[in-house]
Amino acid sequence: MIKICLAGFGKMNHAVYEAALQNADVKVVSILEPTPQKIEGVEMFTEPQKAFALADVIIDFSTKEACVENMCIAASMGKNFVIGTTGINEEGLKKIKTATASSSVSGVLSGNFSVGVNVFIETARYLHERLPDYEIEMVEVHHNQKKDAPSGTALRTLAALGKTKEEIPVHALRMGD
């Protein structure tokens, strides 16, 4: 059985938790969260070292700032990890890569696990290459609890086009839940 620690307990890690309940091969054993809640059968922690000690793998959907620190700690403890947190800057990614390289851990970084989003990004890149004179403007809509605006997915789409948010207008709408 693979023992999992969830770093952050927002919408995405709630979904991971629910999926883990349906799979006998994995178990969420700990959650790292600044404001712990009570969840039956799961240890809640505010300190990464304590939360990670119980797990084989860390799944991080926290904040870009916390994620960098979390993954450096995870690597130093020999814990493999999956990063779903978006918006990590180049300096943060470099810190994670350095920490990972000096240990024996493996990690996965994906700002969006949706097949549809990844196909969309590739389609946008394809169209931009073939229609270079067309104007581009980006409008994205997320639930009102989404913390980053524009989202990491929007920024990744811009990067795939070789553009920045200063070059292409980005309208980030947050509404509903």
Kindly label every feature range from the protein language model.
Residues 72, 85-107, 118, 123-127:
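Rossmann-fold NAD(P)-binding glycine/threonine-rich loop
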Residues 28, 44, 81-82, 106-107:
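Hydrophobic beta-strand scaffold residues
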Residues 3-7, 11-49, 131-177:
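C-terminal substrate-binding/catalytic lobe of Rossmann-fold NAD(P)-dependent oxidoreductases
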Residues 56-76, 87-92:
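Beta-loop-alpha module in the N-terminal Rossmann-like domain of NAD(P)-dependent dehydrogenases
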Residues 7, 11-16, 70-80, 85:
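P-loop/Walker A phosphate-binding loop and immediately adjacent motor/lid segment at beta-alpha junctions
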Residues 5, 58-60, 81-84, 108-110:
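Short catalytic-loop micro-motif centered on adjacent basic/acidic residues
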Residues 34, 86-88, 112-114, 141-143:
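Short, ordered loop/turn segments at secondary-structure junctions
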